């Protein structure tokens, strides 16, 4: 009897030890991983900053100076025309700067109705994500895709017309494939990618 | 019993190979005559500096990334100024991974390989000229005007460039559509601004021969003093010691002041001079040989360029001139009229240069030089190849200088449209002229036999979009 108890106790101890190994390993050797922020939270946080900066530039700079006070215009060829860069260009310039400094993430502003055809969705996930955020108000799209042999966590966030400047510019641009945008409409999406391998 | 024959041979092989290998390695690392290392004829853009191997091969173990960084080190600022249409960041974006798999445009060396003369085309491009097709297959459906065009025609004059499209984008074409060949006002950019700047640096009392402060041992003859006194330097209060002595050793007389002296006051001109083909060997960081161990290698820079080493036709009697500031600007008579045209023709002997002196541009230049026409109306070699460049400081203040990098706007030649041609000519006239090689060889005497259609296409597309929009149809 006592022999069986000892055997059972030993087995339980052994199993318990085996079960504890991954936890201990994570605690002692993989503390950084254990405390790592989930990648979805990372993209959500990145997007919060991007969306805030984008809204501030669009509303407090472009819409105020161009549409309300009419002191300067915003133009695609802002250098030649001594104008402000368009909000989409500001966003893209930021993305290019980030791309010069890190490969830990990348982002772009895309649309199912792009003024510049280069900003139409290219990957299957971009198409799916942009369609999802356009049809599901207030919801984000998350997925995983493999591009160039690398795996990415891909998040798509709706890009909404936050000011009259967005609507008037896109509806009036000769290259815009859609001319019936209204304030608060989803005009496209911010796609953020984080490599996962 | 002697040493076995095989062992003898091994020892002999080692005794020969190791020293030879060390010598080669030392030459690779430190310098010397490295011409035996060249694996193929260097492009015209780099042949002058081909023996300063580490200008591009900055690491012995570097691959494409190292070479790319070296390209950007010299050409990065130029690409940024040109609003590069295909920056690296466009291709590091994962969404373009499929495109990169076909054409890795993240690195300069994908399209511009050095030492590959058999596949090198204009501007050092080593890819076939249908490279645009790799990413832009849909262009015919997006732009009906482009249907049926050859895939090799994208970069034809007046259409598209890979990097610099500042004079070719659609809005620019539309904005300048319908301009006359000869604009109402025909003056070079910044002519008045440069004149006001020149006046600003004149001192209240210009220096004269009696003011010369050269020590008696180095006093020049009367002709030198007269040249200097009539020169802009004396007018600006720059005395003999201003150029013939340096800050580090003010007592030491510099018999022949070099580029370093000029740089003290003319930093932009000297910088751009060392960016172009005339002065690229004088870039501060270029070394023919670097300091080596045991005094075996002594640091030395590249020798100044000579016309004999040029790949363009040059005059035989100028073959051994060396190219520094004084080549075009004589030491004591800073004659900009001479420097702007005759100095060029002193060495260059190609059809374009020779034809200049029978061209309408030269007629205008002579009239301005003779005081018969307003400043800025003459067109010299420098007007087109060394145009005035405006610089704006972060506080908004303006300055301007004549770029001394004569390659800056040379190729693709549409780069010249904005900085030069558009000051006097309509865009259509300029694009047509720049697309006609024979007219260029004749130095623009006559009219172009080539017509570039890009403005008409842009105009047609503008009308079509307006019509569709007026009818409420999707674009």
Tell me the role of every PLM-derived stretch.
Chain A
Residues 1-12:
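Bacterial N-terminal signal peptides that target proteins for export
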Residues 11-20:
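Bacterial N-terminal signal peptides
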Residues 24-161, 175-197:
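Extracytoplasmic c-type cytochrome modules immediately beyond a signal peptide or single-pass transmembrane anchor
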Residues 162-174:
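The canonical Cys-X-X-Cys-His
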